[in-house]
């Protein structure tokens, strides 16, 4: 498939940082977790979600996890995507629910509302309306775990990181003591220049 991958380990972050900041990518957090009191997870997508869940599963207190989310996302309910007999009615029912929601919607916003009402989509916080959908999938138990995090920083994209603060475009946020910053901000898949599927002797899938 003609697409480009973009993960924290192999790309330069879209923000700058001071040299004395304790910093790692999601790919290497297992090797660097020891010796810190707080963990600042930068990135609100699936990688950020999985990193927060991994920290919780490894007995880090929710109070010591600080999740920087530039934009909240609509999330797919995992039970609707399981190819197992136990989830047959959930998965097939979700397909019907999606078609019904799309057919009955009067706008894009209304469509997302209807998909949420039917249990197809989930969100982290009922008080915060998501503004993106990249297809990230979570279970209802994972969602409940994420909802135990009291410190979710919603100030847009990080511009610069120093030991004492995160700099955003319009504000700053004070860093907790002895914190490890975990970069989960890569977009995973990026768009490339459009190409014709059939071009002479070349086929681009």
Spell out what each predicted region is.
Residues 37, 150, 178-180:
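Conserved acidic residues
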Residues 51-53, 76-80, 192-195:
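A short acidic (Asp/Glu
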Residues 1-2, 69-70, 184-186:
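Short loop/turn segments at strand-loop or loop-helix junctions that form parts
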Residues 1-59, 65-66, 203-204:
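Glycine-rich dinucleotide-binding loop and its adjacent helix/turn
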Residues 159-162, 167-205:
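Glycine-enriched catalytic-core subsegment of oxygenase/oxidase enzymes
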Residues 46, 50, 137, 141, ...:
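Short, well-structured alpha-helical interface segments that form or flank functional binding sites
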Residues 56-163:
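Dinucleotide-binding/catalytic capping subdomain of oxidoreductase cores
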Residues 5-8, 75, 190-192:
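Glycine/Thr-rich phosphate-binding loops of Rossmann-like dinucleotide-binding domains
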């Amino acid at each position: 498939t003609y697409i480009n991958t973009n993960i924290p380990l192999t790309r330069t972050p879209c923000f700058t940082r001071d040299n004395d900041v304790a910093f790692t990518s999601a790919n290497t957090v297992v090797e660097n977790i020891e010796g810190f009191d707080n963990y600042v997870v930068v990135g609100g997508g699936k990688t950020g979600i999985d990193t927060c869940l991994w920290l919780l599963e490894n007995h880090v207190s929710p109070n010591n996890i600080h999740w920087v989310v530039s934009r909240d996302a609509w999330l797919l309910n995992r039970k609707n995507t399981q190819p197992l007999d136990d989830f047959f009615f959930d998965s097939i029912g979700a397909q019907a629910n999606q078609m019904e929601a799309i057919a009955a919607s009067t706008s894009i916003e209304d469509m997302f509302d209807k998909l949420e009402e039917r249990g197809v989509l989930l969100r982290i916080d009922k008080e915060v309306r998501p503004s993106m959908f990249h297809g990230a999938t979570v279970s209802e138990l994972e969602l409940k775990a994420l909802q135990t995090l009291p410190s979710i920083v919603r100030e847009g994209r990080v511009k610069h990181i120093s030991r004492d603060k995160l700099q955003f475009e319009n504000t700053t946020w004070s860093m907790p003591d002895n914190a490890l910053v975990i970069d989960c901000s890569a977009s995973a898949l990026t768009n490339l220049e459009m190409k014709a599927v059939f071009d002479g002797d070349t086929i681009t899938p």
